[in-house]
Amino acid sequence: MFTINAEVRKEQGKGASRRLRAANKFPAIIYGGKEAPLAIELDHDKVMNMQAKAEFYSEVLTIVVDGKEIKVKAQDVQRHPYKPKLQHIDFVRA
């Protein structure tokens, strides 16, 4: 079971996403279910190590946002074209 700590994004848009990536974080979103979509930011290195395992894409993950646990599955992963970096992940509530 994977547990990921996340923070709610305060800013959105291209410039805000670039600032996140420069700070070794990256944007993500949680959607699905009856709740509203939630824009979050994740630590790049921690998630990069987790996603190296195949189970990251098949198991239910736990994301902790403001002390609240959300069960999700990775739906879509966007990677940098030539660098070994994650650009964005879509999570769907499980």
Curated annotation (Swiss-Prot):
UniProt name for this protein: Large ribosomal subunit protein bL25
InterPro entries the UniProt entry points to: Rbsml_bL25/Gln-tRNA_synth_N, Ribosomal_bL25/Gln-tRNA_synth, Ribosomal_bL25_short, Ribosomal_L25_dom, Ribosomal_uL5_bac-type
Lineage summary: Bacteria, Pseudomonadati, Pseudomonadota, Gammaproteobacteria, Enterobacterales
Pfam families the record matches: Ribosomal_L25p
Family of the protein in this entry: Belongs to the bacterial ribosomal protein bL25 family.
Function statement: This is one of the proteins that binds to the 5S RNA in the ribosome where it forms part of the central protuberance. Binds to the 5S rRNA independently of L5 and L18. Not required for binding of the 5S rRNA/L5/L18 subcomplex to 23S rRNA.
Keywords in alphabetical order: Ribonucleoprotein, Ribosomal protein, RNA-binding, rRNA-binding
Subunit structure as annotated in this protein's UniProt entry: Part of the 50S ribosomal subunit; part of the 5S rRNA/L5/L18/L25 subcomplex. Contacts the 5S rRNA.
Calcium found in the keyword field: no
SUPFAM superfamilies listed in its UniProt record: Ribosomal protein L25-like (SSF50715)
Gene Ontology molecular-function annotations: 5S rRNA binding; structural constituent of ribosome
Keyword Ribosomal protein in record: yes
Any one of the GO BP annotations: cytoplasmic translation
GO CC aspect terms: cytoplasm; cytosol; cytosolic large ribosomal subunit
